[in-house]
A protein has these predicted regions:
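Residues forming the flavin
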Residues: 61, 75-78, 89-169, 211-218, ...
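Intrinsic-disorder-associated interaction segments
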Residues: 20, 177-188, 209, 213, ...
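Short, low-complexity intrinsically disordered segments enriched in A/P/G/S/L with frequent Arg
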Residues: 3-8, 17-25, 29-31, 35-36, ...
């Protein structure tokens, strides 16, 4: 049976939708809508379902595209060409979404599918996907784009790294604990169908050789490790960009107001959280040139990704949004020849191994494996450079790279795990003169730094050419480094050559999702009409589960429309 195309009911807002898992779990009754007065930016008069006005209005410093015709009966545009320090008029919509990563995107997709007349504004700090290109490919080094074009912009950071969709609820964070395993797995199927309808490859990695998988698992068990074999749909970096480009076009054509190069500075909260009377009324935003205005909305969704995790943590503290510090992952990205990982790559594509090595028994795991891939650099606010990896469908290297992450849980009185991880990252950057550090594993065991001339003689040639040879152990804490070393030695028992002397370790690899927003199964926070999704919420880790959280949120909001 041929795969349905872009004209499928899922994409075009048919009422014939897949079942809404959350709605079957006993949702709260929808609160009555309050009518918002028209304003001098957008003026509404009625809500026809089928009239669609497609327009792009651009004012200095903010691109607003996809003005809803079915939500805007009469469109009045009075956008002033104001100076950068003046305030512009407010905007009123039904739903405002902060962050155009997978969680924010799928909130909009699912909401439009079941409630196509909903007026939605999607606020994104970065650029449209067609303008998201890293200059490093041309100039050979990071030029410090602000904000980083790899971590910000439409589709977020995950889709721009390797584009892997994990098709099991066992991978991707703790969301199943919140909503239930069955609900999570059913939502994965709906999200996967959506990606397929936008052009994802139908081939699934890791399901063709169960006998080989069983043997790899046996070897892992003998080494004291757990293998999580998860089916993977690999988009590839270049294919992910094509798919998300189609999704961006679809949202624009459906009338979503896409506000790029626009930063959310605050949420608008009325009432008192201490007396359970607090409610979110929208957000305040600032454009690239400094213009500020408010977006008033009945529902506010914050999905700022790992890059926005510390910002959301500050927001939670300022507005008494209930949250708690969670674990933080600190580690390295390792790189080795494809020959070492050939069997695992061919059978599983991505091996997810978990261990609790002596002496500290911290959880250590592999993450984001890229056969034939490339190590990359990402920049966060403040110029923090962190390492990542990605892979292409067509372009291949001679190496495989993957992350090894050590999970740190902190006890009272310490409650700043994100700041802790950033300090470690800053120390790595200082030792590398602003660049990513790289060191050979054999040199670590020998207690010496790595020199550039030694890398040039190695069988493993770095795919991040501007990484600086040095001493990773001088930057990572003893507990972290010891756990990583012992984990690598254990993996070497299951995959001979994994811990060879020439295996490269790049640092720092940091995952900023340690702030966990307290929510219920309906994805409600303690602030009415405010929802926090994706990796910044602390509940998901990765592309698929962030998409799932957005899918469920969109279905929930549509049921109340």
């Amino acid at each position: 049976m041929p795969r349905r195309g872009f004209g499928s009911p899922y994409l075009e807002g048919s009422r014939e939708s897949p079942p809404r898992s959350l709605s079957r779990r006993g949702l709260k009754a929808a609160s009555p809508k309050t009518s918002a007065a028209p304003n001098n930016r957008w003026e509404t008069a009625g809500r026809g379902r089928h009239s669609l006005l497609k327009s792009c209005a651009t004012m200095e410093g903010v691109c607003v595209s996809g003005i809803r015709g079915d939500a805007v009966g009469a469109f009045v545009s009075t956008i002033p060409n104001t100076s950068s320090n003046s305030n512009t008029s407010n905007m009123t919509v039904d739903v405002v979404i902060v962050g155009a990563g997978p969680a924010g995107i799928f909130t909009a997709l699912s909401l439009l599918k079941d409630a196509p007349s909903t007026a939605i504004a999607l606020v994104e700090k970065g650029l449209p996907i067609e303008r998201r290109s890293c200059p490093k490919a041309k100039v050979g080094h990071c030029v410090g784009c602000e904000p980083c074009r790899i971590t910000t912009g439409f589709s977020g950071a995950g889709a721009f790294s390797d584009g892997k969709l994990s098709l099991s609820y066992e991978v991707g964070g703790d969301l199943p604990e919140l909503i239930g395993e069955d609900v999570a797995q059913a939502a994965i199927k709906r999200v996967d169908d959506a990606y397929l309808s936008f052009g994802a490859d139908e081939h699934v990695e890791g399901i063709d050789n169960p006998g080989e998988v069983k043997d790899i698992r046996r070897r892992a068990i003998q080494a004291g490790l757990k293998l999580v074999d998860c089916p993977i749909r690999h988009l590839g970096t270049e294919k992910a960009q094509e798919i998300y480009g189609r999704i961006e076009d679809h949202l624009r054509d459906a009338g979503v107001k896409l506000l790029f190069e626009t930063e959310c500075t605050d949420v608008i909260i009325e009432g008192d959280a201490a007396t359970d009377s607090a409610a979110c009324k929208g957000v305040r935003v600032r454009t690239r040139t400094g213009e500020e205005f408010s977006i008033l909305a009945e529902k506010t969704v914050v999905a700022t990704g790992r890059r926005g995790a510390d910002w959301l943590e500050r927001l939670c503290s300022e507005h008494d949004i209930e949250h708690a510090p969670g674990p933080v992952d600190i580690g390295v990205r390792i790189e080795m020849r494809n020959e070492i990982m050939e069997r695992v790559n061919n059978v599983l594509y991505e091996s997810k191994l978990i261990g609790y090595p002596n002496p500290f028994r911290n959880k250590v795991r592999t993450f984001c494996q890229n056969p034939g891939g490339f190590v990359s650099q990402e920049n966060y606010d403040g110029g923090l450079a962190v390492v990542n990896g990605h892979s292409y469908k067509e372009r291949k290297s001679e190496n495989t790279n993957l992350a090894i992450l050590c999970t740190h849980n902190f006890l009272e009185p310490f409650n700043q795990p994100i700041a802790y991880a950033k300090k470690i990252g800053e120390l790595c950057n200082a030792l590398g003169a602003g660049h990513i550090l790289v060191q050979r594993f054999g040199d670590i065991l020998d207690g010496k730094r790595t020199w550039q001339k030694e890398l040039s003689r190695s069988n493993v040639r770095p795919t991040l050419p501007d990484a600086v040879a040095g001493d990773v152990t001088a930057a990572l804490p003893y507990r972290t480094m010891t756990s990583i070393i012992n984990f690598m030695l254990a993996v070497d028992e299951a995959i001979p050559g994994f811990a060879s002397a020439e295996t490269l370790l790049y640092a720092p690899e940091l995952k900023f999702y340690s702030n966990r927003v307290k929510m219920d199964a309906n994805l409600d926070t303690n602030i009415a009409n405010l929802h926090c999704l994706g990796d910044s919420s602390g509940w998901t880790r990765g592309l698929m589960m962030a998409s799932v959280m957005g899918c469920l949120m969109g279905e929930r909001l549509a049921s109340e429309a």
